[in-house]
């Protein structure tokens, strides 16, 4: 979490940096490193005379690393790949005639929850002085759900529920390299590159469109698709500067080709019908 996640070109003998697996090659032989990241968030929201306080804790990552042999380091850990969490509502009133009894109030509640998690293990090796290479292999899994539930003030009108859920499980593979050179007694510059493999993901996506009376589903459609998601390939480069192990500066640039990845789309046709299908971004 330090330096806002910058680290493609940075390495340290006593600090974990899973932004580039090549950094594991510089682990200290006398250290076993263990790192946990947690975010605590407090929010105060107000609108008119109403106000609300929210408090939230979020797990960021857990990682450990140690030296296996001279010039060879190992790291493993668990970290969220993505997270979803929201809840909001909208309300509108329409008139179908004259008088208060003709007013129809529509309330829609939107919710989203879930996320993807990643467990990984990686190796970093230094074949030449100043040059190190590394690889992270991981497993990705998780579920995410987005829902919209619409209710009407007229009890004779059925509620509507539309829900989109997907489940993913697949592997991840990331490669990295670093080169460092001391240019003065206390100054070291470094260059790093990383590459994340893009590929299709195993899993499923489902779309539900239901009419609900009370707590019972009166009618509805369910459409399921399999193996529709893919990860884009990722390329990153970084520059680093280290002054006497007291001051570090880093600059990273990362490109993710989401335009070539696939996901799902709900398409409305000319006749008003809808199609849930695989789509390119």
Q: What spans do the regions from the language model cover?
A:
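N-terminal, post-signal peptide beta-strand-biased segments of exported outer-membrane/organellar beta-barrel
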Residues: 1-82
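Outer-membrane beta-barrel porins/channels
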Residues: 1, 67-281
